[in-house]
Amino acid sequence: MALDTSTKAQIVSDFQRAQGDTGSPEVQVALLTARINGLTGHFKANAKDHHSRRGLLKMVSQRRKLLDYLKGRNVDSYRALIERLGLRK
């Protein structure tokens, strides 16, 4: 599901490194996580929506790639991000 403008702006302001930062891996992962969480609710009501499921899998893959990139560049930032988003147990 697409995020509305106010939700997206809130996520960007929470995870940006500096003012106006929208492209850092932290922001991109947070936005993808919000979209993924929105789609998981959609699949509870629409279990046979395979077209959207493919999009979900692409988003999960993109998030995984960004997290791998961030882990290679800055492990402390990676750990802080997954803690804030609640991605790992």
Swiss-Prot record:
Gene3D superfamilies cross-referenced by the UniProt entry: 6.10.250.3130, S15/NS1, RNA-binding
Instruction: Show the GO cellular component annotation of the record.
Output: cytosolic small ribosomal subunit
Which GO molecular function annotation, any one, does this entry have? Answer: rRNA binding
Task: Cite the entry's keywords alphabetically.
Answer: Ribonucleoprotein, Ribosomal protein, RNA-binding, rRNA-binding
Report the NCBIfam families cross-referenced here.
Answer: S15_bact
Q: How does it assemble?
A: Part of the 30S ribosomal subunit. Forms a bridge to the 50S subunit in the 70S ribosome, contacting the 23S rRNA.
UniProt family annotation: Belongs to the universal ribosomal protein uS15 family.
Q: What is this protein called?
A: Small ribosomal subunit protein uS15
Its taxonomic placement starts with: Bacteria, Pseudomonadati, Pseudomonadota, Betaproteobacteria, Rhodocyclales
